[in-house]
Amino acid sequence: MNLVRGKPASSVVQRALAVLDAVARGGESVSLAAIAADLGLPKPTAYRLLRELAEAGLVRRATEGSGGFTPGPRLESLALAVMQHAGSSTARHAILSRLVDELGETCNITVLDGSQVLYLDRVESPWPLRVHLQPGSRVPLTCTASGKLFLARLPKLRRDRLLAQMRFERHTDRTLADRASLEQELERIRKNGFAVDNEEYLAGLLCVAVPVSDSRGKTIAAVAVQAPVARLPHERARSTLPALERAARALAATYDTGLTRASRSRASASRGTR
């Protein structure tokens, strides 16, 4: 597909990747003007690239008339596939196994997948009393520790769009079953930097989650521990944070190579257009 007339295909690919990188890393939404200025592209060129990328589902226009652009569903799907790549998942599984050894409870790595939480990896504890959720399982956003963490750390426009589509189902008598209560909880999570599911999804189960963030502070995954409240009562939830945060930093490092390559690609494309 020739996105820009009169330019070599390799140059077009580099520019398209640079635009995708700018949108993916731009926070809530990125305007055409900001993308053009950031990459040193003429506005008509940037617009043609964005239009073609939008037609491919890689970007989409932000809501509420902002005129900006956000990652599209196809780009989100590709990102998820990369995160599941076997080459990096081996290192992440080893980190997760060490975390289970340290805490003595089941731990998992999750990502945001549309309007649900997807289990990327999971290592079970040796305890006979535990909950079995295999990698590939999906759970709700509004009543799980990882889900609430993702919601709390999303840009406001995207969070509002997701919450507007949510059905607030009550799973236990502790589930936050209305948006106002959930919004208060999300504010606490943003302030504290971690999330707790205190029997909100499954009675008798407590879960603590912390973010795995890239170099810009964007949440790319979550790492969590879960255990029966008989072994991990709510008042002991904070005791798991040092180990969880060490694991989160180690997990973030497994993404560094890919993020560095993307940044170099973006810088190269930008230099080539000036």
Regions of interest found by a model, annotated:
Residues G65-S66, T70-M166:
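Amphipathic alpha-helical effector-binding/dimerization core
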Residues T257-R274:
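Short, highly charged C-terminal tails/helix-capping segments
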Residues M1-T90, R249-T257, G272:
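N-terminal helix-turn-helix
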Residues H171-T172, A203:
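Intrinsically disordered, low-complexity polar/acidic regions
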